[in-house]
């Protein structure tokens, strides 16, 4: 049986861009041009995840992760053609972000090739920020070095928590001690670093969250994101909550954890610049 298709907006029937994409910015300035590339593959699907991603089991026989870059290349050319039809001027991308899923399920050469295709189709601005998300357990030092040599500039690692029982609830399979190791490797390769954290997991205490914040600050990435857990209907975690196996996160608890994060990160020299993001000066993305 083929996997169910993700729910979302229907594909455009005409091949044209939505009107809001082609519209000028409200202030009359030129809109910055960025490219997001999605890699919809994971080794294990986390119980809270409602993103468009598939495991090898979900893809079924005959499916190939390696074929994805070829398909993505076609999609980028279609996007460029739609922009041309809309009369949008060709502008090099100022930022490229590869998300997922787990982009580092691909071999490094495929990620580098994806960025190269963006350069061929749209161009890359001088000093463009090129980021990929990464699971700490899917990379080693050689992998990160290959990314840096291939033109990527930044890696965002999915740390989520420094507390083992919280990682277990979130279905994360890496060990907490893996995160500082991969950040060191990334720095040696010349890559900027970011860490993603999640707060509000069932069973996570305020002390657990404090430990995660302290661990993240000690690692000292250039950038940090902290997201409140949202349990979406249809996910495995939603079913666990419905069955009474896990408690639903409480709004007051998540609000207190957000305030704790802001205070801890501000005290460590990180500047809040967007709802869920803090950065060292100059490291905003």
Question: Where does each model-flagged region fall?
Answer:
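Long, contiguous juxta-domain segments that are non-catalytic but functionally important
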Residues: 2-26
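C-terminal scaffold of the Radical SAM
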Residues: 17-34, 52-85, 91-285
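Local cysteine-cluster metal-coordination motifs and their immediate loop/turn environment
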Residues: 38-53
């Amino acid at each position: 049986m083929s996997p169910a298709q993700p729910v979302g907006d229907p594909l455009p029937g005409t091949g044209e861009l939505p009107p809001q994409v082609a519209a000028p910015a409200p202030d009359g300035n030129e809109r910055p041009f960025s490219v997001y590339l999605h890699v919809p593959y994971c080794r294990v699907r986390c119980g809270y995840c409602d993103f468009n991603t598939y495991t090898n089991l979900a893809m079924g026989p005959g499916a190939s992760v390696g074929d994805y870059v070829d398909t993505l290349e076609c999609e980028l050319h279609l996007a460029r053609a739609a922009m041309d039809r809309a009369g949008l001027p060709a502008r090099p991308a100022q930022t490229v972000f590869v998300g997922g899923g787990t982009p580092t399920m691909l071999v490094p050469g495929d990620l580098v090739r994806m960025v190269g295709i963006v350069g061929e189709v749209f161009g890359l601005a001088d000093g463009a920020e090129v980021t990929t998300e990464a699971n700490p357990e899917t990379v080693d030092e050689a992998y990160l070095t290959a990314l840096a040599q291939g033109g990527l500039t930044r890696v965002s690692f999915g740390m989520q928590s420094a507390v083992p029982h919280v990682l277990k609830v979130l279905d994360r399979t890496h060990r907490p001690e893996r995160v500082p190791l991969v950040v060191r490797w990334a720095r040696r390769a010349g890559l900027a670093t970011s860490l993603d954290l999640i707060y509000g997991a069932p069973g996570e205490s305020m002390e657990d969250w404090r430990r995660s914040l302290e661990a993240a600050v000690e690692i000292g990435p250039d950038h940090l994101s902290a997201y409140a857990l949202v349990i979406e209907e249809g996910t495995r975690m939603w079913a666990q909550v419905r069955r009474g196996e896990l408690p639903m996160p409480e709004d007051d608890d998540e609000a207190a954890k957000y305030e704790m994060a802001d205070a801890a990160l501000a005290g460590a020299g990180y500047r809040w610049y967007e709802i869920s993001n803090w950065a060292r000066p100059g490291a905003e993305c």
